A protein has these predicted regions:
Chain B
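Structured soluble/peripheral alpha/beta segments that form catalytic or ligand/cofactor-binding pockets
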Residues: 1-328
């Protein structure tokens, strides 16, 4: 968020809003980007600032003012009404307040995109806070049309004694200051009447919530699951050679995707977030156990920005730590018996066993390819391996396990997660592999080009070897791939990367990830329509779109 | 009168709060008509205790109860004369051993008709005093409580009844052996069949006497936000073990405005925790849920020319809202 007053411009506000939505509610941005595809939008504000807005893949990209297809100029009245907390979004328009120029179909597309942005983002508490902050620091951007507070009602007045009036205007809820580990409550909803003196609306008819704040939810889920993992790891001897090491990888916190999926799926089905925390912690322990072993198998040197466990303490201790993490994870799953009861715990054991089986099978497929210096010929081979190795434990199983924690054990319901999150999981893995090649190491955490050094069979590599026609080049690439990791040099990795760029493998993978994610999102909306629109489902939706808007 | 038909019901409900809201006691003693000739009526009793430090504790539905429970509706007691009220889980905890005393006069909150000849009559009595012992695992506390008692009789079933929202608040100031200066009770029946049969009332007691009854056309009820699901505890313990299906979220804030002539009343309740009682439903497998919600309540207004303005702990009950109960 901007800190100096001079930075509080209309252009900066738009950029901050787009950045916040990319991180917190990517589904909103994806919907807006869908409307604006192929249109270059120019925006000017009454403080003199200007920007351009374009669409790249499913991302809205802010840039300096440039030639545009549609130009929009906001005056202070338009700013006052756009995103105004006091007014309904449909009341935004004032005559002559907006100057919009361009071809009519494109103007309408831009209007749809902004309607989507304002209507769907306006309920997020963070976005409300962002705009309040700007309005406080640069009130001139908005003019001075802030409505006065409503007067107290007069007992003799015939009207003015309405329950909604109190909740909306006279005694609105103050900004919530719940502690950071609370899951939910990232959006505001409107008060509603249960009884107006004539008609009744059941109290259990909840208002649908389509979007939620992914960032805040992830933060809360990460914190709760990290605390649970700390509790699950024993504080006893041998500390130096086992339990202290067991804590190392869990302490190197990741994004918190799995904990969020698990807890959100539980909440989506009406369960208590608390009931999914231990299962989510068990998944994280399994995951960290797999990582320790995976790093040894891949001969990786870095994990989440620090040396890998075996690089620091040797392979013997590291293997044992991986085993211990898996044991602790099993113990954690079983310990749900006392809180969730027998039926749900049995279902959790079943789901966990399935997840572990998929993971070791996927790992076997990939290690077999590397061992034989084979590169699969089709993307489908990669999809199968990726789904087994990471798709189940990263995406599909967390959702299913979260639903089980809420009391759902019917396979026909649980299976509805599979196809959506299989596709999203593959897209996510492709993106992760792309980040290893073209990402920012500080943000990415792993060693850049590490996948090329360890010979990981990625979509880019498969595409490259499928595309390269020159036998000499193919021979050279195969020879590099056949080297053991310690024998590969940075130059070898650079050669592979250059060949991928030349063959268009990077762009191919970006496009493929986008298409897979879009199919996954389509399945999400269709297959999971049995879940009502609530905040838990809204978080799952944001994660489904997270892949398409994650910056590369 | 003995219960004869399967859906005939008689509920005695008790709810008490300590003046600092540190302890809350809720008990429901229910009787349901027999399944047929020669069968005895079904009797269930559940006891819930909430302690600020130790959270919710609940018996199963088979709590031990008095043969002749204290109730001014069953056998009228003189004001100020105490009667025993001992209810305990079969395991021994939670348990309450209380002496109850009336301080005011009960009154009918509403008589509602809905469904195919179904009906209920709801009678309320705020300002009931309770003193004695509350027992939780490893803890025993002497308590002085102020609360509410009701009787609901009639013949009803789900889903015809749908659900209800009901609550009470007693102004806790004044001497502990006197009726509260002010007490408010409200009821809103949200029948599902037919929807138009919804009915309700808001009632105000002053020093033990009912001084105003706002009929259903004279008040509004609104809600905002939902209670954090982590603050909703499923009871009785057996319901957790059975993996009872989730229910709708409980509203976090409830606001009632009532107006009649120059009288007006505002009740603003903010829930903080709730126990969801999963009741076995006689007409199908899915449970019917009653959420006992504890929270802070602010009451203000002008009634009969006198201003009132107080804050006190209150209890609001949200009944219904189990999605799968809709499928009966």
């Amino acid at each position: 968020m901007t800190t100096d007053t001079a930075g509080y411009t209309g252009a900066r506000l738009l950029a901050d809003t787009i950045d916040a939505l990319a991180e917190r509610a990517p589904a909103v941005l994806a919907a807006a980007a869908e409307q604006m595809r192929g249109i270059r939008l120019g925006l000017r504000f009454n403080d003199g600032s200007a920007v351009s807005l374009t669409v790249r893949h499913s991302r809205l990209v802010i840039g300096p003012a440039a030639e545009s297809d549609v130009e929009v100029a906001f005056d202070d009245r338009a700013m006052n009404l756009l995103f105004d907390l006091q007014r309904h979004p449909s009341d935004q328009v004032l005559p002559d307040s907006l100057d919009v120029r361009g071809e009519s179909d494109r103007v309408l597309a831009v209007w749809r995109a902004f309607s989507l942005l304002s209507q769907r983002a306006a309920g997020l508490r963070f976005v409300q806070g962002l705009w309040r902050d700007y309005r406080h620091h640069r009130p001139q951007l908005w003019g001075h049309a802030i409505p006065a507070p409503a007067p107290e009602p007069d007992a003799s007045e015939p009207g003015g004694w309405h329950a909604l009036d109190y909740l909306e205007r006279r005694r609105p809820e103050a900004t919530r200051t719940d502690d950071e580990t609370r899951v939910g409550g990232t959006v505001t909803t409107r008060p509603r009447l249960l009884w107006d003196g004539r008609d009744s609306t059941p109290w259990w008819d909840e208002l649908p919530i389509a979007d939620a704040d992914l960032y805040d939810t992830m933060k809360a889920c990460r914190a709760r699951v990290a605390a649970e993992m700390t509790r699950l790891v024993p504080d006893r001897e041998p500390r130096a050679d086992l339990y202290s090491l067991v804590r190392e990888y869990p302490a190197r916190q990741g994004k918190g995707l799995r904990p969020t999926l698990t807890i959100a799926a539980c909440a989506a089905f009406g369960g208590r977030p608390r009931d999914a925390v231990r299962a989510a912690a068990a998944l994280e322990l399994f995951h960290n156990g797999f990582l320790v072993h995976d790093d040894i198998a891949d001969e990786s040197t870095h994990r989440r920005g620090l040396p890998t466990l075996h690089a620091r303490y040797g392979e013997g201790l590291a293997v044992n730590v991986g085993d211990a993490l898996n044991l602790l994870a099993i113990d954690a799953v079983l310990s749900n018996l006392e809180t969730l009861g027998l039926a749900r715990t049995l279902a959790l054991i079943r789901e966990t066993l399935h997840m572990c089986r998929e993971s070791v099978e996927g790992q076997a497929i990939e290690l077999g390819w590397i061992h034989r210096n084979a590169v699969p010929g089709t993307d489908d081979d990669y999809f199968l391996m990726s789904t087994k190795k990471t798709g189940w434990y990263t995406c599909i199983s967390p959702c299913r396990i979260g639903a089980v924690c809420a009391g759902v054990t019917d396979p026909r319901v649980l299976d509805r997660f599979d196809e959506a999150f299989r596709l999203i999981g593959i897209a996510f893995q492709i993106q992760d592999d792309l980040l290893n090649l073209v990402g920012d190491q500080a943000k990415y955490g792993k060693e850049l080009l590490g996948d090329l050094l360890e010979g990981k069979r990625t979509v880019m590599l498969i595409h490259l070897l499928r595309t390269v026609a020159d036998p000499a080049e193919r021979k050279q690439l195969t020879a590099i791939l056949g080297k053991r990791r310690p024998d590969k040099t940075r130059r070898d990795a650079d050669t592979l990367l250059a060949a991928m760029r030349a063959a268009g493998s990077i762009d191919y993978a970006v496009d493929l990830a986008d298409r897979l994610a879009a199919r996954g999102i389509d399945h999400f909306e269709r297959d999971l329509d049995i879940i009502p629109d609530n905040e838990g489902k809204a978080v799952l939706r944001q994660i489904a779109h997270y892949v398409t808007t994650r910056p590369l | 009168m003995p219960l004869r038909a399967p859906l005939e019901r008689r509920w005695l409900h008790y709810a008490f709060l300590s003046r600092d809201s540190g302890q809350s006691v809720i008990a429901n003693l229910s009787a349901l008509g027999p399944d047929g000739d020669g069968h005895a009526p079904h009797r269930t009793t559940i006891l819930l205790v909430h302690d600020r430090e130790h959270g919710w504790h609940s018996s199963q539905f088979n709590a031990d109860r008095p043969d002749h429970p204290w109730s001014s509706f069953r056998s009228p007691h003189a004001i100020g004369v105490a009667g025993d009220f001992d209810v305990a889980a079969r395991t021994g905890v939670p348990a309450v051993k209380l002496r109850l005393r009336r301080t005011g006069r009960p009154c009918t909150s509403q008589s509602a008709a809905f469904g195919g000849g179904e009906h209920l009559r709801w009678q309320s009595e705020p300002g009931v005093l309770a003193s004695g012992l509350v027992r939780l695992p490893g803890i025993e506390r002497d308590v002085e409580l102020l609360g509410y008692h009701e009787r609901v009789r009639g013949r009803w079933s789900w889903p015809a009844l749908g659900g209800w929202v009901f609550g009470f608040v007693n102004d806790p100031v004044g001497r502990s052996d006197e009726p509260p200066p002010t007490a408010v009770v409200f009821t809103l029946i949200q029948s599902r069949d037919p929807r138009a049969a919804a009915s309700g009332s808001v009632m105000l007691w002053r020093r033990g006497r009912l001084v105003r009854h706002f009929p259903r056309r004279a008040f509004q009820v609104a809600v905002h936000d939902v209670l954090d699901r982590d603050q909703v505890v499923l009871v009785p313990p057996l319901a957790r073990a059975l993996g009872t299906a989730p229910a709708a979220s409980v509203p976090r804030r409830l606001l009632i405005t009532a107006r009649s002539g120059s009288d007006r009343l505002l009740l603003d309740f903010r829930g903080s925790t709730a126990a969801r009682i999963a009741n076995p439903c006689e007409t199908g497998l899915p449970a019917f849920s009653v959420h006992e919600t504890l929270g802070a309540c602010h009451v203000e207004g002008v009634v009969a020319g006198r201003r009132l303005d107080f804050q006190a702990p209150g209890i609001v009950e949200f009944a219904g809202g189990t999605g799968d109960a809709d499928d009966h």
